[in-house]
């Protein structure tokens, strides 16, 4: 990573940012370009740190590889629907949060038997390897749910469309993007049952506190400028999704 404020566009002056490549509306790779709310926030932060868009290098950060990518220095920061948890903070540091999601369920449009997590006993539930979503459902709401893991959310959506599973669980904003991409074949239940603070993952080292403060300042600036709200609206267009106004926009003070 280059010194902040640099304007050179040489290869040495790149900032490497981990995102998801398979989450419509959040982090999505499409014909060599990147789009989604996480991408928009990442670009805003990088610009505030002194990097141009051309100096940003996006790298795929699958859920189960996020901590290792930060620890190994493969990326400078990760914005990949990365919930801040005490367990994760043992391995990495966080800035943010830049968004508070809520865990929800997605079902086929004609599904009538599933209206919340407590209806999942005996049902097949898909989540992504390395995420905490399905464990929450099994431990708190439906002990007899059958869990199925897939490498990505797109695979979970495909399993749902083909009838292999009965529901998909993850954060509401991710599900909203997947439902929009299904063109009406899938729907989100719309009753979030957790709060998931999305953080910017950074390497745990001597400079992480100073880095977190700079990132938090950038997020705060994005919220105040109206860009944050515009990014939400742009990336959930065509769905009924509205972020929970009780928690959003959040106060970014993690890691300071």
PLM features: what roles do these ranges have?
Residues 40, 47-48, 111, 131, ...:
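Extended ligand-binding regions for polar small-molecule ligands
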Residues 55, 133-147, 188, 219-256:
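Ligand-binding clefts/hinges and TM-proximal coupling segments of bilobed small-molecule sensing domains
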């Amino acid at each position: 990573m280059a010194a902040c404020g640099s304007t050179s566009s040489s290869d040495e002056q790149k900032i490497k940012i981990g995102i998801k490549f398979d989450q419509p509306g959040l982090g999505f790779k499409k014909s060599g370009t990147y789009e989604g709310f996480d991408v928009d926030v990442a670009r805003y932060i990088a610009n505030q740190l002194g990097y141009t868009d051309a100096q940003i290098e996006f790298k795929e950060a699958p859920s189960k590889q996020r901590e290792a990518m930060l620890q190994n220095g493969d990326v400078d920061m990760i914005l990949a629907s990365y919930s801040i948890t005490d367990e994760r903070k043992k391995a990495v540091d966080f800035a943010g949060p830049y968004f508070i999601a809520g865990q929800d369920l997605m079902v086929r449009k004609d599904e009538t038997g599933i209206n919340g997590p407590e209806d999942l006993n005996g049902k097949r539930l898909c989540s992504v390897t390395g995420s905490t979503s399905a464990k929450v459902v099994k431990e708190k709401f439906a002990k007899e749910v059958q869990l199925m893991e897939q490498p990505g959310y797109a695979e979970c959506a495909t399993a749902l469309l083909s009838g292999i599973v009965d529901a998909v669980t993850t954060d509401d904003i991710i599900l909203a993007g997947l439902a929009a991409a299904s063109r009406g074949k899938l729907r989100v239940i719309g009753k979030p049952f957790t709060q998931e603070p999305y953080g910017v993952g950074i390497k745990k080292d001597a400079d992480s506190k100073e880095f977190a403060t700079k990132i938090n300042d950038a997020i705060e600036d994005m919220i105040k400028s109206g860009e944050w709200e515009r990014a939400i609206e742009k990336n959930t267009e065509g769905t009924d999704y509205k972020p929970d106004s009780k928690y959003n926009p959040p106060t970014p003070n993690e890691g300071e």
